[in-house]
A protein has these predicted regions:
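Alpha-helical transmembrane segments and their immediate juxtamembrane cytosolic regions
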Residues: 1-172
Length: 172
């Protein structure tokens, strides 16, 4: 629960900063916000997800992801195969669900639909992997440190790239 709240809050911070610093390209419902929401929404249904056989859960999650892949563009279907049209969203709340209103723009947009089903695909895949303690015999300190600080690294990468790009352009 804590991890979901922290990730969701980090996504809110990114949204607030981009709304001020880059108002022409704000981030609304970006990947961090989504991952926080998906984690928080998965907590109350965790026991239900565990009761679903992993092969069935994997197949259903993939099928629902594919069916809902293009809801953001106003139809059910996958990669341009239009099964049925769906109405536009009406506000920010419907945009979070996956139904953006006309004129909606976000430079990073990962709404609950369809992405929650891809998230749950990972949940079911993790249950299918064999249990092996010897998969990585000894930890690699650099990777361990990066894993412990991955949110901070993610939050720092964009401002760092924006700061370095003018120097890189001058060198070219």
């Amino acid at each position: 629960m804590r991890r979901g709240l922290v990730t969701f809050a980090a996504g809110g911070l990114v949204s607030a900063v981009t709304a001020v610093v880059m108002p022409e390209n704000p981030v609304f419902c970006g990947v961090l916000t989504f991952m926080g929401m998906a984690t928080l929404l998965s907590v109350p249904v965790k026991s239900l997800l565990r009761r679903i056989p992993p092969q069935l859960g994997l197949a259903l999650s993939i099928a629902l992801f594919m069916l809902l892949r293009d809801v953001n563009d106003g139809f059910l279907g996958f990669e341009g195969v239009r099964i049925a049209a769906i109405p536009d969203g009406t506000d920010w709340f419907t945009a979070v669900l996956g139904f953006p209103p006309p004129g909606f723009h976000s430079s990073d947009y990962f709404p609950l639909l369809p992405w929650l089903f891809l998230f749950w695909t990972g949940v079911f895949l993790s249950r299918l992997r064999p249990e092996r303690d010897d998969l990585l015999l000894r930890p690699i300190p650099l990777f361990t440190a990066m894993g412990r600080h991955s949110l901070l690294i993610y939050l720092a990468h964009q401002p760092l790239l924006y700061a370095l790009m003018p120097a890189v352009v001058k060198l070219l």
